[in-house]
Amino acid sequence: ACPNANILRLFKSMGLKIDASSIYEAERAVAAGFDASDISLSTQEFPTDDRLFSLVAKGMSVNACSLNQLERCGTLFPNAKVGLRFNPGLGSGGTQRTNVGGPASSFGIWFEDIDKVKKIVLGHGLEVFRIHTHIGSGSDPEVWVKAVGLSLNLVRSFDAVTVLNLGGGYKVGRMPDEETTDLQAIGAPMREAFERFQS
């Protein structure tokens, strides 16, 4: 979302990559010197075919954020690799604006639509290489741990997945009565969940 080319160039010099939430952000990053292959696009508003083709042809990856987007990806890029953004069924945010998971959120493919997803993937010969979930920027460790479990269950549904992107911000308390995310409280049970998944 950063519009400042100098900051984007600084990020590039640090070896960071871009998680773009619109085609405009992706194009802005390319204009600042990023390779398209360093950009992942997850967007509510799917771009026009020509703009999408241009960056995908140069290596940009796409997370389909709805069944309709997945169908379009399959039509435009049959037999390609694709990421999937799922709504894991729960979210965490200090306000409704920062809570981007759960029934009230329009972000991501609803996790219970997994059979519909598999049908589209199979029909277009797609290879799902990444699962992306994003619950918001809340501080509740219990929600984060549940989201990890749900996300790992989604990973189990696709044999070729090599990347799990657990999205969401870590809340920083700015006012005396606001909580800050306790990374230790979140991190330890998340690590245990990943270790159980690997065993």
Residues covered by each model-derived region:
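Active-site anion/phosphate-binding pocket segments in diverse small-molecule metabolic enzymes
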Residues: 71, 168-199
